[in-house]
From Swiss-Prot:
Quaternary context: Heptamer of 7 subunits arranged in a ring. Interacts with the chaperonin GroEL.
Species of origin: Nostoc punctiforme (strain ATCC 29133 / PCC 73102)
Protein's UniProt name: Co-chaperonin GroES
Annotated SMART domains: Cpn10
PROSITE patterns referenced in this protein's UniProt entry, alphabetically: CHAPERONINS_CPN10
Gene this protein is translated from: groES
Length: 103
């Protein structure tokens, strides 16, 4: 069996799913102390890198997503599925898990 190679360009979300590149969490405190991985808070901000086509309405048409690729978004802390591609962290979310677009 051939190995599966994933990259951002090969991930295409379905339905109302949103693929978000997670902003790195702080490595050290304001006082200069380095934080161990167990003490870091899970990031809640990231950049949208891919969108699904939207959820289907009862009449079969698609409901367009309110966000677009490139938007910086704030999402629920424990929402979605965490995915690591190379050294980068991503999260696959449902549109309803996105709380706001950060301007």
């Amino acid at each position: 069996m051939a190995a599966l190679s994933l990259s951002v360009s090969t991930v295409k979300p379905l339905s109302d799913r949103v693929f978000v590149k997670v902003n790195a969490s702080e490595e050290k405190t304001a006082g200069g102390l380095y934080l161990p991985d167990t003490a870091k808070e899970k990031p809640q901000v990231g950049e949208v890198v891919a969108l699904g086509p939207g959820k289907r309405n009862e009449d079969g048409s698609r409901q367009e997503l309110e966000i677009k690729v490139g938007d910086k978004v704030l999402y629920s802390k424990y929402a979605g599925t965490d995915i690591k591609l190379g050294t980068e962290e991503y999260v696959l979310l449902s549109e309803k898990d996105i709380l706001a677009v950060v301007i």
